[in-house]
């Protein structure tokens, strides 16, 4: 029997396991998962202490702990040493944010897509490739790692991002950034491991971690930048194994890590032997390029640079720099996931990067981002918005009468797609009410301006919210 009486005692969750089928830890985990997914337990709800739950249910503490761990590995719970266990902020949100093409009337400002204008240049490269004698070889299995030309192209790309790579033997190729991150997590982490990151981060990391049973831990921040003290605390108390960061225009907060912050992260990584995954997805878009974290901690950092935001999203290719300590494991994971990346895409990317057209493509991208941000600022400069003129998305902090989720729903009802802060949240604490707005995804400047006007109208006419929802 329970030691204490719970008849008049408040608990945020009082599961009933009277009719549960053994093993009890699995049955309890299933009840907890169902209560979260059904909405009975809301995002941010703090669960009762595990000892309290064990007493209430009259079962062993270890049984409760095993149940909590199972649900945590599915990404539905988050915990912090000394703070307790919470229902994850994104537990009731779809974190898959790829473009949906099922409604042409919706103005796309959710998914981050570069313009299609410069794709015409890419088409000319493709046409030339398939007309060449012997082009059949690009449709065969091929290992780009074996090509010195491809490796040297990757080195050139890295050097353009201020990562000084002299040894082209540490280069790997993946079918896009998400593919590269998946390979790194699958090869260097195991179920139950913890990886630290920002309080709001790219949802793709969360979906991979959830699939692999890896717990994502939010690190203490100051002005959207991870603090050295917070990182040390997470290493000592949360026992994180690694760290995932987007150092330039972090998705979704738009923050770029300061040089001091990069040095601090590198210092802590070396001290605690952390695996740092540096996602350089936006680095090439910056006019003033910073020194990558990898430059300060090459032995601890895996640097992933995708071509999707700079050249084209359909060019599914990322260059990866890894120290020899991780190289073979990541290489094996990439082989198991892909066998190989497309030889056609690797050849095409190499030709573009080694041509004058690369600068032309990047210039087109940058100009469109700048032009769209001018339109954005024209209408929304009176609101709290993060993001500079070269950033391909903005982070709009909402007035208190909106949650991110409610604003996303309202905007969609008026024909504009944006993404709420709940989609990006890590952990179970109170959220900032915000939405991410992609500035380059609308089909034209006119369509983008129309979408921004709709957003401004929603912000100014909050008396219609209850009716809309």
Can you say where each PLM-predicted feature lies in the sequence?
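Short beta-strand "wing" residues that participate in macromolecule-binding interfaces
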Residues: 78-79, 165-166, 418
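Conserved core of the PLP fold type I
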Residues: 138-272, 277, 283-300, 456, ...
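Conserved core segment of the aminotransferase class I/II
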Residues: 302-367, 464
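Conserved glycine-rich beta-strand-loop-beta hairpin in the small C-terminal domain of fold type I
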Residues: 366-377, 385-398, 407-412
């Amino acid at each position: 029997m329970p030691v204490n009486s719970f008849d008049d005692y408040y608990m945020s969750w009082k599961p009933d396991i009277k009719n549960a089928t053994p093993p009890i830890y699995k049955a309890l985990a299933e009840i907890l998962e169902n209560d979260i997914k059904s909405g009975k337990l809301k995002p941010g709800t703090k669960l009762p202490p595990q000892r309290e739950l064990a007493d209430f249910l009259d079962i062993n503490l270890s049984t409760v702990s095993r149940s909590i761990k199972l649900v945590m590995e599915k990404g539905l719970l988050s915990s912090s040493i000394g703070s307790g266990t919470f229902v994850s902020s994104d537990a009731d949100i779809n974190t898959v944010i790829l473009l949906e093409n099922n409604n042409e009337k919706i103005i796309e400002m959710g998914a981050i897509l570069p313009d299609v204008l410069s794709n015409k240049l890419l088409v000319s490269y493709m046409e030339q490739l398939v007309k060449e004698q012997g082009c059949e070889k690009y449709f065969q299995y091929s290992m780009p790692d074996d090509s010195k030309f491809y490796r040297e192209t990757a080195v050139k790309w890295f050097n353009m991002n201020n990562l000084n790579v002299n040894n082209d033997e540490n280069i790997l190729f993946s079918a896009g950034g998400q593919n590269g991150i998946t390979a790194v997590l699958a090869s260097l982490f195991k179920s139950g491991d913890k990886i630290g990151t920002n309080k709001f981060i790219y949802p793709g990391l969360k979906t991979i971690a959830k699939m692999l049973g890896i717990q994502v831990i939010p690190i203490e921040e100051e002005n959207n930048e991870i603090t050295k003290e917070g990182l040390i605390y997470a290493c000592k108390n949360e026992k994180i194994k690694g760290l995932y960061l987007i150092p330039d225009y972090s998705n979704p907060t738009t923050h770029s890590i300061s040089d001091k912050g990069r040095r601090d992260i590198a210092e802590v990584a070396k001290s605690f032997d952390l695996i740092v995954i540096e996602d350089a997805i936006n680095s090439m878009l910056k006019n003033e390029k910073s020194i990558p974290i990898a430059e300060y901690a090459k032995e601890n950092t895996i640097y992933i640079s995708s071509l999707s935001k700079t050249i084209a999203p359909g060019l599914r290719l990322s260059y990866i720099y890894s120290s020899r300590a991780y190289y073979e494991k990541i290489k094996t994971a990439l082989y198991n996931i892909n066998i190989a990346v497309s030889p056609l895409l690797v050849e095409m990317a190499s030709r573009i990067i080694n041509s004058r057209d690369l600068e032309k493509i990047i210039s087109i991208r940058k100009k469109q981002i700048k032009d769209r941000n001018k339109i954005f600022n024209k209408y929304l400069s009176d609101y709290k918005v993060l993001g500079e003129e070269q950033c391909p998305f903005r982070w709009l902090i909402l007035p208190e009468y909106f949650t991110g989720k409610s604003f996303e729903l309202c905007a969609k009802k008026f024909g504009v797609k944006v993404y709420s802060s709940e989609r990006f949240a890590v952990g179970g604490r109170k959220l900032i009410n915000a939405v991410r707005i992609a500035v380059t995804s609308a089909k034209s400047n006119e369509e983008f301006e129309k979408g921004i006007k709709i957003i401004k109208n929603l912000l100014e006419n909050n008396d219609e919210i209850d009716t809309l929802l």
